[in-house]
């Protein structure tokens, strides 16, 4: 079993309806799928790959060797207790945001700025596809994420998490990234095309998200689940630690503004059914998520203050 791979370019041709159906089915049955022919230039993707890997080697690799995950793993190995590090991720991370560009590594600033704009455009297109498949007005999801604003400067949160999962001497004792669902909206992942490790939970089984050169992996977060009234599900996923290879992962998140009110869209409800989720302010949801990220998601929807 493998996650769906969808040719996004066919949205503009004779196979549009088939492609829309494939995306709808992937959102409903998986919450994860891969896009090929998505429109982001290959030359740009190659630059992003090289610069991200170079940045890790020159600016982050040495620091990771003395990081908390390394120290804790070494201590655990010395104890030889048979335990596993349950609350630690074997991951190096830095985050790129619009307002912290002065903190971006200088050698990647121009390229990553260009890449983020391309990914932001792809996120908008994907949300419009979801609008259409859910029977929502065009632009509904994006408008909801931007506090109901249709024009002007976007208020939605758009961040890019650049991760590396370095070789781990004891991958059986630590997670690359613990299992979780994503809190926000639409996630667009440019993952390593050589080293695997990302898995998604499907029908009780962990399925590898197969490396596919220059594809963009799409996954739906908790807020898409809420807006669709459960028709689309946010999927549990994790990253395994590896003994060999330094796995690269560049995930961009198009999330609601912290002030945005999120709830099931009326047209997304099945006829005769009740709303399955409360309406809440996304920032309030994030307050709950911060303490419950790696726990079952259903209690989060109950714990958040409803409007």
Swiss-Prot record:
GO terms for biological process: defense response; ethylene biosynthetic process. Keywords: Coiled coil, Ethylene biosynthesis, Iron, Metal-binding, Oxidoreductase, Plant defense, Vitamin C. Enzyme involved in the ethylene biosynthesis. Pathway: Alkene biosynthesis; ethylene biosynthesis via S-adenosyl-L-methionine; ethylene from S-adenosyl-L-methionine: step 2/2. It catalyses: 1-aminocyclopropane-1-carboxylate + L-ascorbate + O2 = ethene + L-dehydroascorbate + hydrogen cyanide + CO2 + 2 H2O. Residues 106-134 form a coiled coil. PANTHER family: OXOGLUTARATE/IRON-DEPENDENT DIOXYGENASE (PTHR47991). Fe cation binds at residues 180, 182, 237. Pfam families: 2OG-FeII_Oxy, DIOX_N. This is 1-aminocyclopropane-1-carboxylate oxidase 5. It comes from Arabidopsis thaliana. InterPro entries: DIOX_N, IPNS-like_FE2OG_OXY, IPNS-like_sf, Oxoglu/Fe-dep_dioxygenase_dom, Plant_2OG-oxidoreductases. Transmembrane segments: none annotated. Its cofactor is Fe(2+). Its EC number is 1.14.17.4. Binds 1 Fe(2+) ion per subunit. 2-oxoglutarate binds at residue 247. Residues 152-256 form the Fe2OG dioxygenase domain.
């Amino acid at each position: 079993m493998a996650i769906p791979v969808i040719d996004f370019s066919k949205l503009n041709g004779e196979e549009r309806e088939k492609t829309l159906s494939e995306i709808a089915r992937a959102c409903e049955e998986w919450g994860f799928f891969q896009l090929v022919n998505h429109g982001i230039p290959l030359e740009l993707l190659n630059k992003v790959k090289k610069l991200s890997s170079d940045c890790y080697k020159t600016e982050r690799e040495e620091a990771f060797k003395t990081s908390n995950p390394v120290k804790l793993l070494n201590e655990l190995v010395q104890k030889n207790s048979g335990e596993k590090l349950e609350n630690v991720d074997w991951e190096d991370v830095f985050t790129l945001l619009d307002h912290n560009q002065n903190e971006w590594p200088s050698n990647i600033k121009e390229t990553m700025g260009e890449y983020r704009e391309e990914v932001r455009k792809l996120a908008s297109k994907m949300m419009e596809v979801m609008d259409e498949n859910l029977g929502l007005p065009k632009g509904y999801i994006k408008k909801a994420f931007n506090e109901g604003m249709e024009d002007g400067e976007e208020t939605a949160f758009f961040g890019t998490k650049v991760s590396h999962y370095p070789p781990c001497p004891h991958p059986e004792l630590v997670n690359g990234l613990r299992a979780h669902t994503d809190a926000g909206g639409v996630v667009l992942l440019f993952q390593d095309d050589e080293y695997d490790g990302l898995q998604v939970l499907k029908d009780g089984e962990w399925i590898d998200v197969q490396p596919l050169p220059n594809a963009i992996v799409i996954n739906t977060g908790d807020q898409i689940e809420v807006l669709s009234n459960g028709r689309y599900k946010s999927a549990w996923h994790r990253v395994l630690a590896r003994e060999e290879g330094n796995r690269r992962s560049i995930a961009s998140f198009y999330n609601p503004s912290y002030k945005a009110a999120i709830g099931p869209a009326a047209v997304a409800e099945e006829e005769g059914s009740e709303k399955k989720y409360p309406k809440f302010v996304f920032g309030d949801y994030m307050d709950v998520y911060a303490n419950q990220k790696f726990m079952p998601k259903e209690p989060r929807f109950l714990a958040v203050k409803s409007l």
